[in-house]
């Protein structure tokens, strides 16, 4: 089920809001595909989804660097795999593939995102919480960088 739940929280309000937005965009895409919406509508959703994905991954990776997350390289690799599948979906939609194939790939991306948030992203939650605690301890504890909430 493609729904946000509190157990998906990663300890950063900003990242949680990004995740909610990504889930909403994937739901919109799935709905458009199932409803047989015009190709232009689906293309617009895909462009927005790809752009927001890039924005979110960059923000998340920046926060993980600030948090000194040890699993950052693996996390970036997971993000890159998502980007590949998203690109594959865009190619499928631009080609002559039927909507059933596109919907199948869209469903895969939806499932992947939920598993990623509940699995990979939960692994960095302690690092985010430690970063927040360092910030609360005062200046000089975080290298002077912005908070994960900004």
Model-derived features: where do they sit?
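Small-residue-biased structural context
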Residues: 1-150
């Amino acid at each position: 089920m493609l729904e946000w739940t509190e157990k998906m929280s990663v300890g950063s309000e900003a990242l949680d809001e990004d995740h909610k937005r990504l889930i909403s965009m994937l739901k919109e895409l799935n709905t458009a595909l199932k409803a047989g919406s015009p190709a232009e509508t689906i293309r617009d959703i895909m462009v927005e989804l790809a752009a927001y994905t890039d924005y979110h991954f960059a923000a998340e990776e920046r926060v993980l660097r600030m948090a000194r997350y040890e699993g950052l390289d693996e996390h970036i690799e997971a993000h890159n795999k998502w980007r590949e599948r998203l690109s594959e979906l865009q190619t499928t939609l631009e080609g002559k593939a039927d909507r059933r194939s596109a919907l199948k790939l869209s469903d895969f991306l939806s499932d992947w995102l939920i598993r990623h948030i509940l699995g990979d992203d939960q692994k960095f939650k302690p690092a985010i919480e430690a970063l927040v605690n360092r910030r609360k301890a005062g200046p000089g504890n975080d290298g002077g960088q912005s908070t994960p909430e900004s």
